[in-house]
Amino acid sequence: MQTQGRVAGKVSAKTTLPEAHSRGYLPHIEGAEFQMITYRLGDALPKDVMQRLTLLDREKRHTATEQLLDAGYGQCWLAYPNIAKIIIDNWLYFAGKRYTILAYVVMPNHVHVLIRVFEGSLLAKIVQSWKSYTAKQIATQLSLNGLKPERPIWQPDYWDRFIRNQT
């Protein structure tokens, strides 16, 4: 099951100069208005595969990771409509306040969301709040059904792609 959506909003063509930072995993860009974000469930890739991926350069690692995620490894908790709804409702909660959602898709073991970050909001804080809140909600939902994830709900980091207008 894939849950897709598009939320309309006023989109500015203005971009600001981005600032890069890293928590030691992946480099991230702040200050960029348009961002494509991907994050995955904690069990979406086996540990041995993740170790092999570190040997690849960034672009090849990203491509290989996307292919592996699309193969549907792990518990695929996001395939359940009630779990996918937690994710979507969470994104929509701050839409219009911290960011505009342009498009999203919830896959069985990972998500993609395209947003325009508002001035004064930090992408790292936005993603951290999404993952923190939804991890608690998903764990609660799973426990109500007698299920418990073997690994943390979410991976420790996320992929972001700064979208720029070069016209």
Language-model regions, residue ranges each:
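Short catalytic/metal-binding and nucleic-acid-binding patches
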Residues: 1-167
